[in-house]
Amino acid sequence: MAYISSLDILETEIAIKKVKDFFESHLSKELDLLRVSAPLFVIPESGLNDNLNGTERPVSFDTKSGERVEIVHSLAKWKRMALYRYNIENDKGIYTDMNAIRRDEDTDFIHSYYVDQWDWEKIISKEDRNEEYLKDVVRKIYSVFKKTEEYITTEYPKLTKKLPEEITFITAQELENKYPNLTPKNREHAAAKEYGAIFLMKIGGKLSSGEKHDGRAPDYDDWDLNGDIIFNYPLLGIGLELSSMGIRVDEKSLDEQLKIANCEDRRSLPYHQMILNKVLPYTIGGGIGQSRICMFFLDKLHIGEVQASIWSQEVHEICRQMNIKLL
């Protein structure tokens, strides 16, 4: 049966605004976040850009004054520095609209060269750097997802409700034990299908098999205190990752993870020095994909239905045949 979107293009544009406004407003209230302005590009020598998995090349250019700058991959490090500079109180934080270009992305139905997300970060105490605190924050964020689903399906009754009452917590190692014969990505799909919504914890370090579930930069998340929010998405038959987040590295975990990742050359960068010398505050933070959220709540088959990006002629032809209306 041919795909028919529940909303036409004009309805979709209006609904995108409704979803984003509602989610943003409730997220800021739930986590006590203040909206701030954020950079589109940074100076590489600052160490503030997010190296992601370590292989993605940032888009860079030189300015008229001769400086070389990079388009951000994410604002994971910049936000922590901003909290320090703005003198934000404990248990309060900031959020921003983050726009990025990921030139090495493998584009498909859920991946684009253009990334738009809410990046958020809040200050916590040293004592809050534990798994229970992390789970508590995840539950608060999940409550915002639930409220958003209730709101948008009331506004547009033809849209479907998909979220279970509660989110399930599971570690990457537990996932490997449960589905030993599946690839890491297929484990996520299987768990999302079984539970409806999962928070997949402890991503970045090696599992008992000797493999990593997924790569993570060594200098922002603590690999023992991080995770991804993943929802079952029946329309595509996958587990759709909506958010990556975690308690950030302290001086001890940064030291350990730089050694493991063979990235000890980063120690001398200003950002890393400020963590190792206990200058920066302890924080928790993450990114929440705006286009992914709109895809999920508006029952869209392709991310290009909720964001304007560029796609190959082949993708345009496939979408035309499948009745997918790209923005």
Swiss-Prot record:
It comes from the Bacteria. GO terms for molecular function: aspartate-ammonia ligase activity; ATP binding. The keyword Phosphoprotein does not apply. Its EC number is 6.3.1.1. The keyword Amino-acid biosynthesis applies. One of its GO terms (biological process) is asparagine biosynthetic process. Its main location: cytoplasm. Belongs to the class-II aminoacyl-tRNA synthetase family. AsnA subfamily. This is Aspartate--ammonia ligase. It comes from Fusobacterium nucleatum subsp. nucleatum (strain ATCC 25586 / DSM 15643 / BCRC 10681 / CIP 101130 / JCM 8532 / KCTC 2640 / LMG 13131 / VPI 4355).
